[in-house]
Amino acid sequence: METHMAKPKAPAGIENPVQLAVIGAAHGIKGEVRVKTFTEDPMALGSYGPLHMVDGRVLQVAAIRPAKEVVIVRFKGVDGRNAAEALNGEALFVDRSALPEKLEEEEFYYADLIGMAVLDEKGENLGRVVAVHNFGAGDLLEFRENSGPTVIIPFTRDAVPDIDLSNNTIRIDSITAGLDNAELSGEEDEAEGPESARGSRPRGPKSAGEPR
């Protein structure tokens, strides 16, 4: 499973940057790259318009196709494997104005959650969110512990009772989330929590790829 820590330094010239993706390894010899997106619909990445990098460069999607856990993207002007390899690790941003303006209550952009600090009931920092997944049974948050391993918990109201965007923090209920001392000490890498914690909790706009 690929994981990517965020949020890196944002690009200059964007008033309210939102990270949509991070570029991975080159794919083939024609300039394509593997891209991990933080959008609900990975195939919609090209619908947001120009994608900004931290160093000020701007990329536009020329072609996109699905792959396991990522999408394969060819950007305009990126020709050949060497050019593609030079993009490895680059984060891609858009201004928030490019996203649909209104969210429902208890709805969040996946991109907003990446990099948020995960706190337990006592306020202890457990790590930071590195990914949001959905394998068909509901949204899951993956966070990387301060000591190293990653943990997966259900993204439900019971397991994640508080999300504070202004302070960039998420508070979890350790028991409902299915965490125990063994998992937090690194003996287990993943925990999906009890089935009773998989209540409905809307996330991310359904039309995440539609430009304004």
Curated annotation (Swiss-Prot):
<dbReference type="InterPro" id="IPR011961">
    <property type="entry name" value="RimM"/>
</dbReference>
<dbReference type="InterPro" id="IPR009000">
    <property type="entry name" value="Transl_B-barrel_sf"/>
</dbReference>
<comment type="subunit">
    <text>Binds ribosomal protein uS19.</text>
</comment>
<comment type="function">
    <text>An accessory protein needed during the final step in the assembly of 30S ribosomal subunit, possibly for assembly of the head region. Essential for efficient processing of 16S rRNA. May be needed both before and after RbfA during the maturation of 16S rRNA. It has affinity for free ribosomal 30S subunits but not for 70S ribosomes.</text>
</comment>
<feature type="region of interest" description="Disordered">
    <location>
        <begin position="181"/>
        <end position="212"/>
    </location>
</feature>
<keyword id="KW-0698">rRNA processing</keyword>
<protein>
    <recommendedName>
        <fullName>Ribosome maturation factor RimM</fullName>
    </recommendedName>
</protein>
<feature type="domain" description="PRC barrel">
    <location>
        <begin position="105"/>
        <end position="181"/>
    </location>
</feature>
<keyword id="KW-0143">Chaperone</keyword>
<dbReference type="GO" id="GO:0005840">
    <property type="term" value="C:ribosome"/>
</dbReference>
<dbReference type="InterPro" id="IPR002676">
    <property type="entry name" value="RimM_N"/>
</dbReference>
<dbReference type="GO" id="GO:0006364">
    <property type="term" value="P:rRNA processing"/>
</dbReference>
<keyword id="KW-0963">Cytoplasm</keyword>
<dbReference type="GO" id="GO:0043022">
    <property type="term" value="F:ribosome binding"/>
</dbReference>
<dbReference type="InterPro" id="IPR036976">
    <property type="entry name" value="RimM_N_sf"/>
</dbReference>
<dbReference type="GO" id="GO:0005737">
    <property type="term" value="C:cytoplasm"/>
</dbReference>
<dbReference type="InterPro" id="IPR056792">
    <property type="entry name" value="PRC_RimM"/>
</dbReference>
<dbReference type="GO" id="GO:0042274">
    <property type="term" value="P:ribosomal small subunit biogenesis"/>
</dbReference>
<dbReference type="InterPro" id="IPR011033">
    <property type="entry name" value="PRC_barrel-like_sf"/>
</dbReference>
<dbReference type="Pfam" id="PF01782">
    <property type="entry name" value="RimM"/>
</dbReference>
<dbReference type="Pfam" id="PF24986">
    <property type="entry name" value="PRC_RimM"/>
</dbReference>
<keyword id="KW-0690">Ribosome biogenesis</keyword>
<comment type="similarity">
    <text>Belongs to the RimM family.</text>
</comment>
